[in-house]
């Protein structure tokens, strides 16, 4: 069992190290922002990518779009319809204002990686931080290729998986997102995460 786990970790590391190397080949100088677009497994994938970038000796920062949810009253999020989820779930204005825009400025400009704690239905006290001049920001979560965010990311990874989110509203919103935004077709890279321990790169022209 332990040898199987070690093999899985080695395979996972090789995949993420190769993915990090590709990103650094194209965006190793200056600030860059990478999207991990997915509703299931995106956070874990994003953190693995950050770890691989750091193994390569490159400064990186992780953020989740879920930490930029629109402020809601207790229990309100659970009552959201699929339309609510897609159209009003996330506070993209705050996401840009406190994270994307200052991160791109570089230098000593401070940025914030989380603004709202949905589980507690409260705003998060801003923690302003800085990063190295060549840092890469990895943002994980759903709907990242939607038209309103086009041009935000230098590199987008779209996660393909048969797994579906537990939330019915999110599941239905994903169908609308796929129809409206065509995330698979605008992604820089497509990754099959059917087996999260063995992610596999998929090339659109071979599907």
Region annotations inferred by a language model:
Residues 51-62:
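Post-Walker A helix-loop "phosphate-sensing" segment adjacent to the P-loop in P-loop NTPases
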Residues 34-53:
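Glycine-rich phosphate-binding P-loop
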Residues 34, 61-63, 138, 155-157, ...:
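Hydrophobic/aromatic beta-strand patches that form the interior of the parallel beta-sheet core
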Residues 29-30, 131-133, 152:
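Short loop/turn elements that form and flank the Walker-type P-loop nucleotide-binding site
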Residues 61-64, 70-122, 136:
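Conserved nucleotide-sensing/catalytic segment adjacent to the nucleotide-binding pocket
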Residues 137-143:
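Switch II (G3) loop of P-loop NTPases
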Residues 2-16, 143-207:
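Conserved NTP phosphate-binding and transfer environment spanning the P-loop NTPase/kinase superfamily
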């Amino acid at each position: 069992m332990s040898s199987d786990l070690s093999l899985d970790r080695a395979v996972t590391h090789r995949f993420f190290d190769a993915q990090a190397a590709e990103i650094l080949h194209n965006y190793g100088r200056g600030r860059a922002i990478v999207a991990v677009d997915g509703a299931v497994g995106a956070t874990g994938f994003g953190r693995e990518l950050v770890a691989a970038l750091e193994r390569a000796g490159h400064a990186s920062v992780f953020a989740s779009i879920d930490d930029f949810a629109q402020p809601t009253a207790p229990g309100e999020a659970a009552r959201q319809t699929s339309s609510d989820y897609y159209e009003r779930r996330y506070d993209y204005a705050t996401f840009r204002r406190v994270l994307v825009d200052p991160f791109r400025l570089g230098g000593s400009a401070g940025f914030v990686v989380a603004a709202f704690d949905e589980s507690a239905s409260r705003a998060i006290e801003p923690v302003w931080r800085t990063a190295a001049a060549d840092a890469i920001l990895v943002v994980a979560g759903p709907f990242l290729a939607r038209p309103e965010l086009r041009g935000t990311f230098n590199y987008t990874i779209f996660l393909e998986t048969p797994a579906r989110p537990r939330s019915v509203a999110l599941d239905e919103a994903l169908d609308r997102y796929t129809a409206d935004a065509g995330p698979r077709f605008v992604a820089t890279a497509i990754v099959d995460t059917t087996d999260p321990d063995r992610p596999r790169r998929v090339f659109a022209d071979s599907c």
